């Protein structure tokens, strides 16, 4: 029984890791268009309604300069890795209750994987 549980956990980890690896940054750029209402990326990106998303993968939540984050985000203790971004993009208010983000989330797991893959390519200021 214990071996079955370990195998199931291992399979889940492999599956979730492969879901992130399967993200397509080109498709993610298309999905990200709905995020551009509030967020910018690229060398000339500036904070607006939401913070700049350059270099977001691997960064500490609520720490980007030039944006007034909610106390909930600043105190969340999160680091934006693929797993955390996936959960947050699915349902922001469930992951960080009190976040200022009004977006209800991306329900499609492939869309989330694609956006995360796109964000991983966004470097700059």
UniProtKB/Swiss-Prot annotation:
Disulfide bonds: none annotated. Residues 1-21 form the signal peptide. Keywords: Electron transport, Heme, Iron, Metal-binding, Photosynthesis, Signal, Transport. GO terms for biological process: photosynthesis. Pfam families: Cytochrom_C. Residues 23-123 form the Cytochrome c domain. One of its GO terms (molecular function) is electron transfer activity. Heme c binds at residues 35, 38-39, 101. Binds 1 heme c group covalently per subunit. PANTHER family: CYTOCHROME C. Belongs to the cytochrome c family. Cytochrome c2 is found mainly in purple, non-sulfur, photosynthetic bacteria where it functions as the electron donor to the oxidized bacteriochlorophyll in the photophosphorylation pathway. However, it may also have a role in the respiratory chain and is found in some non-photosynthetic bacteria. This is Cytochrome c2.
């Amino acid at each position: 029984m214990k071996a079955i549980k370990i195998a199931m956990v291992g399979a889940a980890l492999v599956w979730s890791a492969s879901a992130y690896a399967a993200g397509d940054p080109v498709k993610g750029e298309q999905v990200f268009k709905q995020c551009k209402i509030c967020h910018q990326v690229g060398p000339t990106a500036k904070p607006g309604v939401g913070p700049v998303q350059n270099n977001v993968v691997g960064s500490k939540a609520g720490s980007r300069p030039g944006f007034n984050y909610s106390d909930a985000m600043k105190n969340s203790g999160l680091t934006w890795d693929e797993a955390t971004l996936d959960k947050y993009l699915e349902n922001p208010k469930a992951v960080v209750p009190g976040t200022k983000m009004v977006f209800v989330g991306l329900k499609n797991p492939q869309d989330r994987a694609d956006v995360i893959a796109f964000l991983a390519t966004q470097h700059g200021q």
